Amino acid sequence: GRIDWLESNNEYWLERDAALRTDFHITSGFQTEDMPRIKYKSKMKEYYQKAGIATARYHMVDDLAGCKKFVEEVGYPVVVKPDNGVGASDTHKLASDAELEAFLAYKAKEHPDVAYIMEEFVRAEVNSYDAIIDGSGNPIFEAGNVSPMSIMDIVNNDDNSIYYIIKDLPEDTRA
């Protein structure tokens, strides 16, 4: 019979999954045209803002002058990462003009064609919201994941990951 569902739980495969759904007319998930809004960090921000969810201010990395202008607005440190990337790979926390200049040299040499996003650094506990949703869009099971340590620091410092699950969620986490 016809394939009517395609699913994976790996962020790395999102684009391939969407392409297969589009090619085989599978309507159970994201299609190719949906990919920019869920793969590019800069595009996601627009949808978060429409939903009333605050996001870190950002600047698409261009040149030293443009980046320094952004840093003047938000201050150091800033976080720089690929606009289209998985997890915390190739993520940099920059705390000075010297580190910014070193990053721009690294980008020019190693990844000249990769678009990077620069964001203000926000010190906060990371909370996620996970739910099983019924056919009408109502949550039938909810849970939260709290990560008191920055995932970026865990990856960059080869540290241990710490997180815990909560059942009773703060109301603002459901936004």
Identify the role of each PLM range.
Residues 69-70, 103-106:
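CheY-like receiver
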Residues 66, 99:
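Short acidic active-site motifs
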Residues 59-63, 92-95:
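Short acidic-hydrophobic, aromatic-tinged amphipathic segments that line or gate anion-handling sites
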Residues 2-40, 52-62:
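A short, GP-enriched loop/loop-strand-helix hinge that lies immediately N-terminal to
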Residues 13-17, 67, 126-127:
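Short, well-ordered alpha-helical microsegments
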Residues 48, 71-93, 112-124, 129, ...:
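ATP-grasp fold ATP-binding core
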Residues 120-123, 127, 131-175:
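ATP-dependent carboxylate/phosphate-activation module, predominantly the ATP-grasp catalytic core
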Residues 2-3, 76, 161-162:
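Local beta-strand N-terminus motif with an aromatic residue
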